[in-house]
Amino acid sequence: MLTGAVLSPATPLLHPAVTGRAAVVPELRAACARAVTQLLTGEPDTVVVIGPAAATGQWNPFGRLDPSVFAPGLPATGHRSLPPALGLGALLLDQAGYAGRRRLQAVGHDEPVSACVRLGRRLSETGTRSALLVMGDGSARRTLKAPGYLDERASAFDAEVERAVRAGDLGALQWLDQRLAHDLMATGRPAWQVLSGAWPGQGNDAEVLYCDAPFGVGYLVAYLRPSAASTPHR
């Protein structure tokens, strides 16, 4: 049973070692913290962090992110780092004080839609109360100063994701075009499509806490939970 899901960007701006004590986009960090806190009110047995990486696979649930992956000048831990998206998800759980079971699930950047959906279905069939923390960015081509420069298609792509999430229609994320997402540098695509496989139904209650494109990259923070009508009595 899925108790809830959070969508969060996987931006280095969430890591204090990158931005220092003063958050560069404080409202983004605040939205992520609030979303994760809401996720944990569902009392999941396990939180599954899903994020894009070089290849699909599970990572050590006790692993940590080495900040030096973002910039060589940052202090290195000396240990093998988690992929950035998973490491940032783990950091959000740590900051929320979560000490329960966690699973860190990477999904390859180039995984086809069908494989992402199958993985999501497997994650939803554990027989336990699970919550999903889904890490990934929207398009990185929203403005002239964006990492990938301006692509006129970027805003419409991010708006399509936002519409599906606001409507609680996570199954619609299956229809995101993989090639277009690649062209737009939308790294969240495979993780979102894992979510669509895990939780394909409509009518979920959704709350979008942040949706903007600072520095030309689309960031979406949202919390979703089963609607009251679809939640079984415990």
Model-predicted regions and their roles:
Residues 1-81, 86:
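A short aromatic-anchored loop/beta-hairpin motif
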Residues 3-6, 46-48, 103-104, 130-133, ...:
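Structural motif
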Residues 28-37, 89, 116-120, 192:
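Short, hydrophobic/amphipathic alpha-helical packing segments
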Residues 76-121:
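Cap/lid and interdomain-hinge subdomains that line or gate substrate/regulatory clefts
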Residues 110-159:
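Active-site beta-strand/loop microenvironment that shapes enzyme catalytic pockets
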Residues 165-211:
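Polyanion-binding loop/helix "lid" in catalytic or ligand-binding cores
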Residues 199-234:
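Long, Lys/Arg- and hydrophobic-enriched amphipathic alpha-helices
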